[in-house]
Amino acid sequence: MAIGSLSSLGLGSKVLNYDVIDKLKDADEKALIAPLDKKMEQNVEKQKALVEIKTLLSSLKGPVKTLSDYSTYISRKSNVTGDALSASVGAGVPIQDIKVDVQNLAQGDINELGAKFSSRDDIFSQVDTTLKFYTQNKDYAVDIKAGMTLGDVAQSITDATNGEVMGIVMKTGGNDPYQLMVNTKNTGEDNRVYFGSHLQSTLTNKNALSLGLDGAGKSELSLNLKGADGSMHEVPIMLELPESASIKQKNAAIQKAMEQALENDPNFKDLIANGDISIDTLHGGESLIINDRRGGNIEVKGSKAKELGFSQTTTQESDLLKSARTIKEGKLEGVVSLNGQKLDLSALTKESNTSEENTDAIIQAINAKEGLNAFKNAEGKLVINSKTGMLTIKGEDALGKASLKDLGLSAGMVQSYEASQDTLFMSKNLQKASDSQFTYNGVSITRPTNEVNDVISGVNITLEQTTEPNKPAIISVSRDNQAIIDSLKEFVKAYNELIPKLDEDTRYDADTKIAGIFNGVGDIRAIRSSLNNVFSYSVHTDNGVESLMKYGLSLDDKGVMSLDEAKLSSALNSNPKATQDFFYGSDSKDMGGREIHQEGIFSKFNQVIANLIDGGNAKLKIYEDSLDRDAKSLTKDKENAQELLKTRYNIMAERFAAYDSQISKANQKFNSVQMMIDQAAAKKN
């Protein structure tokens, strides 16, 4: 032991040394520190053991909570006959057999678009153009630039629709195996893709419907469309419908009347047959759509057009080209050509001209050219249209090429959708998007998907294939007792793991005087008896005595719980309501008509366990907190005791050093006197 600078302690006395101090200190540490260390070790052991008990109680609480939950007793399972569908059912669904006839599955739209290519990196188009289509109540115009590859176009379609419509490059085989596919992500008739132009109606008129000739002898409703010869033709529509017809029935009748009228006209017969012109109902039959995938103009004419819900009676043509910027002010140089017709910019503009003056002069010059039309839009930019739907822009000389930028134009060729349709945008519908159609216990139902979860609450159906006539798929809904059985098995297992631990930690052997770590802790000693008191709970009913023994649960003479599954299953199947009342609880009314809930046995188990481990006021939580406080207090007491001993033996060492110094001085004096005596004696001799 080394304290301060007292390194020579004991040299004077040969007695007051560090060995003496260490022996004294060891004795004090055994008296003061050792008991605290032992208490701290016991505290740690108790905390570890308490964690184990709480963990075991939590394991017991899992199945107890399930068995004290009402939904466990109304759990259902389903069994499906046939391969037409799969089904799942939620808790509380009435026990029944559901017959489902599947006529059609919901499908997405699948289309081939354009020619085939040798590689996905092949150039799709040599001209600037726009792919136009309509789906899900929205019009899309996908810009396709000259030089874009097949893969680029596919990605542009997907990006423009945020993935609702997917451009896919599919390898189909052959010399040119790559084909652009345009498919919808989702199923249902409202996901159909209509290329080109379209008009849509929303019929709200519930009155009787008569389509014929008006007083002037004109058709009250007619379609004006581009025929197979490229010219516009008007086709009258005739129809009589009673007031009793629904909106859906009226739209279906109008659709049929329009199709028949077009099929009977030689200008449209083939166009209807090959799908270039189509008429469909959408939104569950509430809406009608007329589509020309060639992109031609569509017009609904006649006095009844608005009455039939056509708020817009003619398609609006898109402009072919809009300049990228307003035309530059001042004098412009060079010659440019539009469809081969030249414009001398130096002759059309002046140094003093504003941008607007230059624009007006150039528009006037363009409008004087054959087959071209130009105007200035609200942004002040140049807009050019061509009668043919095609526009070739060139700079005829070096100055003209440079001036194209000042006009907001680029050299190249631009085509409208209609002009590009027969070369770039030939489309073929391979699968038409449609709703699922099925009967549910005889009731006809349509849905946009094959996942059906809104017919009856809690019944979820996935349609997978159609059924044969008069051979419906049958969903058998029955009671599911498996959760009860599984939870009781878990309960038995958790109980049999908990009890031995409680016995070990609370035991006392009178012969050996050995006690468990929690032998004196009343709250822990009481756990087993509290659980066993609930286990022995019984109720007298009209059906006899209800107890856990009736359901196959028993305790042997060693306190080990067991479960007779056969007995349990028999009790569950014979009277499920009695099981629910005994396990979960039952409701009744008192004399005053007030609702009273009688707790079931597992609700009682749940309460016992909750009082032990749930929340800040739980018994074991309070005991755990007391152990934490004891641990902190013991740590503090040990620190104080160690500081006390340190101070005590520092002082003792200093005192020993002082005593030792005094003894050393006395020894020196004694030695001097002794020397003098010895010298005197020597002289006498």
Swiss-Prot record:
Question: Which positions are tagged coiled coil?
Answer: 618-647
Q: List all disulphide bridges recorded for this chain.
A: none
Major location (coarse):
secreted
Q: Name one Pfam family in it.
A: FliD_N
According to its UniProt record, where is this protein located?
Secreted; Bacterial flagellum
CC terms in the record's Gene Ontology section: bacterial-type flagellum filament cap; bacterial-type flagellum hook; extracellular region
Q: Which family does it belong to?
A: Belongs to the FliD family.
Q: What is this protein called?
A: Flagellar hook-associated protein 2
Protein species of origin: Helicobacter pylori (strain J99 / ATCC 700824) (Campylobacter pylori J99)
The gene designation is fliD
